[in-house]
């Protein structure tokens, strides 16, 4: 009889041995079952190329090298698995397991993707051999030289004024004898301290007398010259001398200042245009003088007598008008501000101009309302700053037009027409149409814009509203 203590100890030992054998036997069978065996098709390697060896595979290789248990497929015989009578695995079973693991490792190594190889064959251009036949028969063509192309080029077709192509090569005496338009005396001086250019128009001589309307005789009564000055390419900010009556040898002695940096002034061209003011035929260009300022010493200054050459610009600018438009939808009011005008044409030889602006509201083709500013005496650059308001319901706004006409006040006869623009439904040009569109898109906000005045004939041609007013 064993002691109860000894019986308890033996039972515990037997339980441990039985549990260990059961776990080993069951786990081995589970491992060898099909559910735990991965086929070659189930192996998937993800990641960037080239693929890296998994950590578990590297650990298996290191263990196999330490124990010299790695065999090739030719070293291990393919024998069926048998179990010993006591249920333990035989040596053939161990070899089969080793072979199975080795084959899976070899399969993974063989299927590891490598960097893709692109078989690039050289692209053959041109003829590979002289034996190949040409697709099209060869045609003998004439080889053109650059002279052949430039021989067909005619510069006169691209010149703004074909008659002035040889002016640069002529002296002032030759220009004078060729065109006989007279000569102009002027000077320039740049002030580095105040950054402005001063142009002095002194006098002109030998100007041609105007011809009467029928062309039969010279009309000395209408020889009233004046000079316009600008710095190209900017023709908007121009200056203008006074008109000298009934003379071909006018003396001006007038100075004009242009606020412009020195480097910018060197890139400009001084343009002086001599214009004859005819009371009946209006303003006729006699000739011009163009001086690139990069060719003169601006700081030192200088005086020049230059012969006038013909100008391709037969008509002078009529002037510009600065307007402001504002519409209030809730009140149904169209507000107009006449701010200022500049470089208006002179309408009176002795007094200059007394300009004023007439504003006329046209609904459709019907004149509704007329208003006008006060006239300012003896100026071609008037400042008005006058406001006007027209009652225009919102539903009628799209059919409304505003006609702005600048006149020179004349107490002895009818007022002298200077220029006109139309803004609204029947605008007289793209600038006027753009101003109207901007006002419609920004209600309750004043919209300012400069406009170049147009002739009466031009406005009547493009705007029906211009025909309805006087």
UniProtKB/Swiss-Prot annotation:
- Compositionally biased spans, kind Low complexity: 92-112
Q: Where in the cell is it found?
A: Membrane
What are the Phosphoserine sites (modified residues) in this protein?
A: 114-115
Q: Where is this region: Disordered?
A: 54-112
C2 domain mapped to chain residues: 180-306, 317-451
Q: Which GO terms describe its biological process?
A: cell differentiation; positive regulation of dendrite extension; regulation of postsynaptic neurotransmitter receptor internalization
Q: Which InterPro entries match?
A: C2_dom, C2_domain_sf, Synaptotagmin, Synaptotagmin-15/17_C2A, Syt17_C2B
PROSITE patterns per the record? C2
Which keywords does UniProt give here? Answer: Differentiation, Membrane, Phosphoprotein, Repeat
Task: Describe its membrane topology.
Answer: Peripheral membrane protein
Write out the GO cellular component annotations.
Answer: glutamatergic synapse; membrane; postsynapse; trans-Golgi network
Its function? Plays a role in dendrite formation by melanocytes.
Give the record's family classification: Belongs to the synaptotagmin family.
Q: What is the name of this protein?
A: Synaptotagmin-17
Q: What is the lineage of its organism?
A: Eukaryota, Metazoa, Chordata, Craniata, Vertebrata
